């Protein structure tokens, strides 16, 4: 009769082998490659922080962007900024946070961050916030 320990080892080996062969891929790895492609397609320079050398730089901690001409609502800015902060924490690349905030959050990186942070179910709420601050 097969011992319990041997049977358990066999079950573990089968499960690991089936997961390895099924092509399971982590969401963060897939999202990271999509974010890299998105950021590289929008920039003509190979340097990720090259846009910061323009006349207005945006610090990572700045909540209110003076270029935003819409209604100033601190709660909305904090909510939108939180998406960029969480996206930065997901990818750990400073240019993700700064690019996410460009154009008063009305950009494809912000939209990708919403998708990667699984916030698509409340997308309308965030789009409304972007339209409010960026008019």
Curated annotation (Swiss-Prot):
Residues 1-26 form the signal peptide. InterPro entries: Crust_neurhormone_CS, Crust_neurohorm, Crust_neurohorm_sf, Hyperglycemic, Hyperglycemic1. The keyword Cell membrane does not apply. The modification Valine amide is found at residue 133. It is found in: Secreted. Produced by the medulla terminalis X-organ in the eyestalks and transported to the sinus gland where they are stored and released. GO terms for molecular function: neuropeptide hormone activity. The modification Pyrrolidone carboxylic acid is found at residue 62. Disulfide bonds join 68-104, 84-100, 87-113. GO terms for cellular component: extracellular region. One of its GO terms (biological process) is neuropeptide signaling pathway. It comes from the Eukaryota. It holds the Pfam family Crust_neurohorm. SUPFAM superfamilies: Crustacean CHH/MIH/GIH neurohormone. Keywords: Amidation, Carbohydrate metabolism, Cleavage on pair of basic residues, Disulfide bond, Glucose metabolism, Hormone, Neuropeptide, Pyrrolidone carboxylic acid, Secreted, Signal. Belongs to the arthropod CHH/MIH/GIH/VIH hormone family. Hormone found in the sinus gland of isopods and decapods which controls the blood sugar level. Has a secretagogue action over the amylase released from the midgut gland. May act as a stress hormone and may be involved in the control of molting and reproduction. This is Crustacean hyperglycemic hormones A.
């Amino acid at each position: 009769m097969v011992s319990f320990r041997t049977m358990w080892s066999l079950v573990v080996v089968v499960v690991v082998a089936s997961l390895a062969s099924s092509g399971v891929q982590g969401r963060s790895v897939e999202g990271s490659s999509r974010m890299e492609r998105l950021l590289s397609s929008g920039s003509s320079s190979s340097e990720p922080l090259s846009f910061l050398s323009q006349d207005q730089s945006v610090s990572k901690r700045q909540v209110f962007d003076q270029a935003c001409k819409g209604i100033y609502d601190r709660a909305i800015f904090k909510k939108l900024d939180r998406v960029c902060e969480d996206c930065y924490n997901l990818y750990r690349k400073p240019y993700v946070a700064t690019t996410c905030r460009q154009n008063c959050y009305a950009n494809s990186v912000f939209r990708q961050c919403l998708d990667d942070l699984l916030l698509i179910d409340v997308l309308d709420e965030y789009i409304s916030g972007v339209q409010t601050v960026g008019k």
